[in-house]
Structures are given as C-alpha cells and as structure tokens.
C-alpha cells in the first residue's frame, strides 16, 4: 500500500430506508445550546438541516489500488477527504512541525515542507475537481493549542478558515474542550466572546459544519451534548458519520473544561449509533474517532500492512477498531498526530480502512468509498485510501490569504514583540527535551520570585506544543523569539502554581510518569535544573524510575521533608494521570506560564548573548 490501501467487501445487515434530507446549514439552525442553556439537551439533539456541499469537487491524484475508472450505474464512487488535529495552524508551521517524512523507493527517506491552510485549500479544491460526490470530514482537535494568530482570538479565525475549506463535518477532540463546553457551543453557534467581546464589526457567525460528540454526555441528563451523528445525502446516496472523542479526555483536559460532562467508551458508543442509523436506513457509515495509534514508521507513505494486515500499527485505535461493529465501513482517526493508512480487522475478521493524516494540516487523506445503490452499502473491496502531502509548491488560495492577513493585522502589535534570543533551534522532542528543560527552569525561576523556598519545577510534555526555531519566521531576524512564537509553544494560559509535597510524594509523582494510566504510554515530566534521576526502561511499571537515583542538587530526596514545587495549573489539578500532584498543600497561584517563560527569556538572553539549547541531561535513560 505505500500511500494507498484496499481491502475486500463484506456486506452488512439490511437496513430500513431513510427519509431525512440535509440542506445547507442556516444560521437559524443552531446545533449546540448556548452557555445559558447547556443542560437543555433536547435542543442540543435536534436534527440539523443538512445538504452536502455540491461544489463539483474533483481529483487530480494518481489512483490507488482497488476499484478504478467509471463505475457502472449501480455503483457510485464517493470521495472522502479528511484531516485531523489542525490545532489552529493557519500559517505554515515552522521547524519540524511543518515537515513530513517521505519514504523513497530505495528505502531512504526525505523531508518535505508541508502545511498552511492557504495551500490546504488549494489542494482540497483541486482534489474535488471531477468528483461531484465529495465529502470533507475531520477527526477533531481543529482548535485548541493553537498558534497566536488563532489562539489569541479564541480560535474564531480557524472556524472561519474551516468554513472557507468547506468542511462538512468533524468529531470533537479533547482540545475542543480546552475552554469548556460553553465556548465550544459558541464556536458552533456564533456570537461574541463573553469576556473579550467581538473582534470584528461583523461579529462571529460560528461554524457552518456540525461538530459531533456521540460519547460526550451531560451528566444531568445522560444525553449527548452535541449531535451524535450526521447523514450526508445526494441523489439517493446516503453515508452516515458518527463522531466521538477519546474516553480519556477528562484525564488530559483541565477539570473546568469538562465539568458536568461524562465521556463514554468509543466503540460502544459508535456501535449504539450505528444501530440507530441502521433503523433510519443508512447502511454506509464512517466513524470519526479522535483517538489514534502509532505506526511502525514515521513516513507518511509507509505501507502499514507490509508486515501483515494491521501489523504496522499499535496503540488504542487498534483495540477500538477491532470492537467497532462491521456496520461501520471506515474509521477516520486522530489525536496521536501520526500518519497512517491501515487495514485492521473488524469483529467479523474482515479488514477495514483506518486512516490518520498526521497534524497541523500537513496532510489530507483521500479515500474512495464505492457506494452500491442496490444495497445502500459500501463495497469494501473497492475502498482505497492514500495520504497526500499539502505541499507548498502550489498557488495560495486567495480567500485564505486574505483571511490570514486580516487576523494578522489584529494580532501583529502583540505577536511581533521580541521576548528573547536563542543561538540555535531548541527542540521539544525526546523523553527529556531541551525546550522542556528551559520551560521548567523558567517556572522554577518564577516560582522563586513568588517564594524563595521553591525547590523544583515540573512541566508536562503535552503542554509544550512546538519547538523554538532559530530561523526567522517573519521580519524579526534569526534567533529572535517573538511573543507569537512563545504563544505557539505554550498556548493554554495555564497559571504557574506553587504547592508543598513531602519527599515521598515527589518520588510518587515521578513514578506516576510510568505507572497507572501512564504505564502503557509514559508521560515523562520535564524537570528543572538540579533534579536528576535514572529512568530504566528495561524494567516495568513504577520500577522504571530508580528510587535511589532521585536527587535534588546532588542530595537524595528525603521522604519526610517538605519540598515546594512549581507546576502549571493543569498538573496542579492532577492532570495527565498525576493524581499525587492534586494533593499538594499551601497553594499559591501565580501568573500564566507564557508570561513566566517570556520573563525568563528576557532576563537571561540578549542579541549579544542568546540562550543556547539546554543539554537535556537531567534524566539518565537506560534502554
């Protein structure tokens, strides 16, 4: 399959005919209740008027394996274009975040610059040409953890961009809840921000596409807070979409963001609504799942099935895929920011397409679903799929260029301010990263300003969204770190909090990196200068953190002593599975984490004496 995959068809059970039709969404049809009426689930669950985008969409790609050419009248090829984890990256991402790895015929790899919605729009519009039956869908995390251009304005620019891209439907992801369900309601429905007001004279109209959240329930009513599914229809062709986010969303989002919500099992939820769609006569179904896996190769065009069908991928999506009913024809996934096109067997033992398009708009997936008008089902033997690179060698879409320029005009006075200087790229890759060390040091320095007794700082790796790039992104000059670049690194506006812990609790926190909910996928905290220990990956569970090796400024941690620890507010609430961090005492809440980083860079660097990348040698890793 490099870049493409096909697999055989296995028919589903018969369904009842459908009657509902979709017209293009109007502003009067609001999918999600406003903040004041969040609990009014009946309104949230109201059917959304719908009508597929009828744009004369088209291809422009080399065909993959499988059903080719013009199908007989019985069959209709439906193009499904999909992407995931955009995270508000409207401008081309910089550094490694703006590149993909491509496997060459001789086994070598090369990197390709990719991403930017001006280019994504051009690629999608070109792909749609000649395909009158075309759907564009997404797998969640369209917003949240966004660069300044979008994040400064609560991601209104990204919603506007997705409207221009003619996105038809998306699942929610965990980052859609960063600012809570009320803010998600506003992004869906429109309206000015309740605190910051309107950014433009015309106001904000909200998303033209539905967000789906079948497994996100209002705890009071037990019903989904958003539409659980949506059906695309055109000339008798009907394809249903069910959207879910990962069940573990509350573990990786601030408690305030998911207050009053319950997140249910992904596969069980999809299976439930597949039956609902079956009763409506919808036999062709695609699941949009904001959960993913880890392919065996980082190359976007790696043949995931080369070791054997489904053998080239691991992670949560494998178990989910094996438990999602055979009624579902394809799975569009995300969350792990990986690229893959894999076949994973459904519960009946039949292969089914599972795809993901990396992140940040660097790729999109082009899937062909061949619809059998006689059965109303997808002929799985004809399903083909390929990840396509959003290269930057095509013309920019003028409407997206105008959109970016308009929002940049508003953001520039804040974003262009220099906050520091670096001598080289400072990456956020690896178990311990140079940038992770820098941020932890910044939080320790800020903590000492609040309380001179502060001993150490801990930073969650998921809160570091990008590296710092030496090369200038604009006119600021090489080595200059702007506020916008800092915002891209730390966009969540978490506060820096101080808490007291016993030495025994500090040891327990370090062990929670590799045990409990983090046992299968460790979350290695970034640590401040002076804290050292050994991580032995040849062992299992909590034993991977070697207790006797844990030292602060060269001295062993005293289990009975009290240590003052700086963390961000997400960790201080026990996020990412660090339950012990939620048990601290003597809380002191400081400024936001980006301000702490900016102050540290300003105080410790200049054009003549830039900061060098830290050595990232505080954790000794045994493999």
Predicted regions and their residues:
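Secretory targeting and sorting signals
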Residues: 1-53
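Acidic, metal/ion-coordinating pockets
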Residues: 2, 53, 69-389, 438-445, ...
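C-terminal region of N-terminal signal peptides and the immediate post-cleavage residues
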Residues: 43-71
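Feature captures C-terminal
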Residues: 74-79, 83, 89, 99, ...
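N-terminal leader/propeptide and maturation segments of large enzyme subunits in energy/redox metabolism
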Residues: 293-298, 412, 428-429
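Short, solvent-exposed aromatic-acidic interface loops
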Residues: 382-395, 551-554
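Acidic, glycine-rich low-complexity/disordered segments
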Residues: 399-416
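Glycine-rich phosphate/diphosphate-binding loops and the adjacent beta-loop-alpha structural elements
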Residues: 413-432
């Amino acid at each position: 399959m490099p870049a493409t995959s096909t697999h055989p068809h296995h028919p589903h059970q018969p369904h009842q005919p459908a009657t509902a039709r979709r017209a293009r969404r109007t502003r009067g049809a609001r999918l999600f209740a406003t903040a004041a009426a969040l609990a009014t689930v009946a309104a949230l669950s109201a059917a959304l008027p719908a009508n597929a985008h009828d744009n004369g969409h088209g291809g422009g790609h080399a065909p993959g394996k499988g059903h080719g050419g013009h199908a007989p009248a019985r069959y209709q090829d439906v193009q499904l274009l999909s992407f995931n984890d955009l995270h508000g990256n409207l401008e081309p991402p910089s550094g490694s975040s703006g590149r993909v790895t491509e496997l060459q015929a001789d086994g070598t790899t090369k990197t390709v610059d990719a991403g930017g919605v001006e280019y994504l729009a051009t690629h999608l519009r070109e792909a749609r040409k000649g395909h009158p039956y075309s759907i564009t869908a997404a797998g969640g995390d369209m917003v949240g953890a966004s660069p300044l251009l979008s994040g400064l304005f609560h991601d209104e620019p990204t919603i506007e961009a997705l409207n221009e891209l003619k996105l038809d439907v998306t699942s929610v992801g965990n980052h859609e809840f960063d600012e809570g369900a009320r803010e998600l309601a506003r992004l869906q429905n429109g309206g000015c921000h309740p605190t910051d007001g309107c950014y433009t004279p015309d106001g904000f109209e909200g998303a033209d596409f539905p967000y789906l959240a079948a497994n996100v329930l209002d705890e009071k009513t037990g019903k989904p807070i958003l539409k659980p599914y949506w059906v695309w229809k055109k000339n008798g062709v009907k394809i249903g979409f069910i959207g879910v986010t990962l069940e573990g969303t509350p573990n990786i989002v601030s408690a305030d963001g998911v207050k009053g919500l319950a997140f249910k099992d992904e596969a069980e939820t999809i299976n439930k609504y597949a039956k609902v769609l079956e009763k409506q006569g919808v036999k062709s179904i695609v699941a949009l799942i904001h959960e993913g896996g880890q392919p065996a190769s980082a190359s976007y065009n790696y043949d995931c099935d080369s070791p054997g069908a489904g053998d080239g991928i691991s992670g949560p999506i494998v178990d989910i895929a094996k438990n999602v009913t055979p009624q579902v024809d394809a799975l569009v996934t995300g969350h792990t920011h990986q690229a893959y096109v894999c076949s994973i067997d459904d519960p009946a033992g039949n292969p089914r397409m599972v795809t993901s398009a990396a992140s940040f708009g660097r790729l999109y997936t082009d899937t062909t679903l061949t619809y059998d008008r006689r059965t109303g089902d997808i002929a799985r033997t004809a399903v083909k799929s390929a990840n396509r690179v959003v290269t930057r060698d095509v013309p920019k879409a003028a409407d997206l260029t105008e959109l970016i320029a308009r929002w940049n005009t508003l953001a520039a006075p804040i974003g262009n301010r220099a906050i520091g200087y670096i001598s080289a790229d400072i990456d956020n890759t690896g178990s311990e990263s140079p940038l992770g060390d820098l941020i932890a040091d910044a939080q320790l320095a800020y903590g000492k300003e609040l309380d001179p007794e502060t001993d150490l700082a801990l930073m969650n790796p998921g809160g570091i969204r990008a590296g710092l790039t030496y090369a200038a992104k604009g006119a600021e000059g090489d080595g200059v770190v702007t506020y916008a670049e800092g915002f891209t690194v730390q966009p969540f506006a978490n506060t820096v909090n101080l808490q007291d812990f016993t030495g025994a609790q500090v040891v327990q926190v370090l062990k929670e990196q590799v045990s409990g909910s983090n046992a299968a996928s460790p979350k290695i905290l970034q640590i401040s200068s002076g804290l050292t220990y050994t991580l032995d990956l040849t062992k299992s569970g909590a034993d991977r953190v070697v207790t006797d090796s844990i030292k602060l400024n060269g001295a062993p941690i005293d289990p009975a002593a009290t240590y003052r620890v700086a963390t961000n507010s997400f960790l201080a609430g026990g996020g990412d599975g660090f339950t012990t961090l939620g048990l601290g005492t003597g809380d002191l809440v400081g400024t936001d984490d980006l301000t702490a980083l900016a102050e540290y860079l300003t105080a410790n660097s200049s054009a003549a004496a830039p900061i060098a990348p830290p050595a990232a040698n505080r954790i000794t890793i045994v493999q």
